[in-house]
Amino acid sequence: MSFTVHLNKILQKYQDLEADLNGGKLDNKELALISKEYSNLKPIIEKLNRYLKAHENIKYLQQVIDTEQDLELKSIAEVELYDTLNYLPKLEEEVKISLLPKESDDHKNAIIEVRAGTGGDEAALFAASLFQMYNKYAERKKWKFELLSISDTEIGGCKEASALISGNGVFANLKFESGVHRVQRIPKTESNGRIHTSAATVVVLPEAEEVDVKIDAKDLKIDTYRASGAGGQHVNTTDSAVRITHIPTGVVVSQQDEKSQHKNKAKAMKILYARLYDLEKQKSKQEQAISRKVQVGTGDRSERIRTYNYPQGRVTDHRINLTLYKIEEIIQEGKLDEIINNLISENEAKKIADSNIQF
């Protein structure tokens, strides 16, 4: 099927849906389904109409230039034609992006997990800085940031921390943050001024509901125990902490931040659903090799994706060779949009190249 035929089919489908909605013959269920499909097509049609209108304008302006005797009008048409031809590639790109299949999890909320890696106390401090960076980024995006768990260290770092981030387009924006983040800086305790390298791992999971993944109660092993603080001392006199093991996969989730065992169990189950759902998605991606071609980076969570170099004030994303000298703004203020927008654009470009959409 040619691309022009494909576009005409989309336009016809949109017009048919519009006629159905205005016909007044739909029951509530049909109305809801058709309204959703119509809403999904609307932004595509708007971009497509702008593209088609630009093409019509080019033909008209070319005709004016070829036939107009008035030199002033001819000159105006030439300028407008030049501007329209320069703008056309951007319109083409917008249409192509709108026609790409939407990733099924992009609309979901996300659970973000940060774990200290190699580097001892420095790694724990870096993990805490990253976790705070995502908190600040969520504030900037007007998203809700709900702490799920945190394992603090005595010097203000954290061994691991997780949060549920809720809002519009959360997973679509944060999904490229998964991987190994590396920091290069001089520790405060370093008397010789040597630069140390530490690392932390970030995992971003789409929030999963019970409808997304089936968990059989008999497959769960649930243990309770007393919560402990940073120094290992018990901070609660009751067995409020919960550890849930999913026996078939071996996935283990522990939760102790709440004083209530019931709340800890609910949070642990939320994380468990997300991890099991992610396991299924990762397995599916591995089975479909083509999905690897359209990812920014390898998609492997052991991949080093970004370096934060404090002496140079530099942040480098290795997947797209992007370097910004804004380390304080990024880490302290959560100004991640420039990095994330570039990652999204690169991913879209790879998808377009892989889809072979031609005008």
Swiss-Prot record:
One of its GO terms (cellular component) is cytoplasm. The modification N5-methylglutamine is found at residue 233. It is found in: Cytoplasm. Methylated by PrmC. Methylation increases the termination efficiency of RF1. Coiled coil: none annotated. GO terms for molecular function: translation release factor activity, codon specific. Keywords: Cytoplasm, Methylation, Protein biosynthesis. SUPFAM superfamilies: Release factor. SMART domains: PCRF. InterPro entries: PCRF (IPR005139), Pep_chain_release_fac_I (IPR000352), Pep_chain_release_fac_I_sf (IPR045853), Prokaryotic/Mito_RF (IPR050057), RF-1 (IPR004373). Peptide chain release factor 1 directs the termination of translation in response to the peptide chain termination codons UAG and UAA. PANTHER family: LD18447P. Belongs to the prokaryotic/mitochondrial release factor family. This is Peptide chain release factor 1.
